[in-house]
Amino acid sequence: MGLYATALSNGPPVSRDASADASLVSELQARIENQRSLINIVPGEGSVLGVWVYSGDIYAFRNKAGGATTGMYRSSSTGWLEVGLGNALNFDTTTTNGELVVGASISGATSGATATVKGVSYYGNWDTGAKGCVVVDSITGVFQDNEEIQMSTIAFDGGITEIKENDSIVGSSSGSTATVKKVTITSGAYSSDDAVGFLSIVSASGSWTDNEEIQVSGVKRALVNGASEPSTVTVAKTDGELYEQTIEPNGSYKFVNFNFVGEESLEKMYGASGVGNAFEWDGTTFIKIKTGMTTDTPENVIVFKNHLFLSYPKGSLQNSSLGLP
């Protein structure tokens, strides 16, 4: 390994004494101020509320002008850039027809509005009635309050071997394909060769035929349950209208980076401020983490044994499911 000179000395070192050299202090202060002037100021007003490094980028949080909301900013070669937080829909009244999954196309049954799912956060059991929010983009139309949220799923029965998240599935006779993101079992079990349920899918191609084998790597896992799958089903209802995400003002931010999946390049950034919901950021999608707490404003965030932990005032503690923040 070679070394390269980055500067050349201009004579031998000279010792200077501030008590005897009246200009030394002012010279040093001038140099300090010169370097300070090179620092780009985070936009907004008041104190910087938190700074963190994620995926090689520096992020800072500071109240926007006026103090109504906080801005999330990323450092760049041209200065601080505000991060767009995207649009979201709150939902409730979930069903057993399948779960909302990232990458899926959804539509409003009444409005006909459409969007693509970018992130999902919810609390409670999906099969019995969960509540949460879904971050979306590529939006057309206007979603209405309390309308059914629909998406495409594949119904199956005769399940003999578990179908897992991210499995690539193929229809044995139709040649149709899709990638599985969630599996919902409504009755039966793989152990008794009679599992019944729904596959929440993305990247689907072709139309599946009733009773054809659903294969993974050429091996039968289940049978298609119904003609012309995938079919459009209701998975939840909107709880309000589409809104632009914002961050509550003030707070003191804590952060942690962690990869819950174990695959390369899937580390995400998690934050808590004490004034709003905790959040997740993957470099593209910002989503607030809903826990169901009455006052859902955690002060601290940490990861322990593949669980995300959030702490609240007066000692309350919430933790995620294993590997599922």
Over which residues does each language-model region extend?
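Residues located in well-ordered beta-strands
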Residues: S105, T116, V135, T179-K181, ...
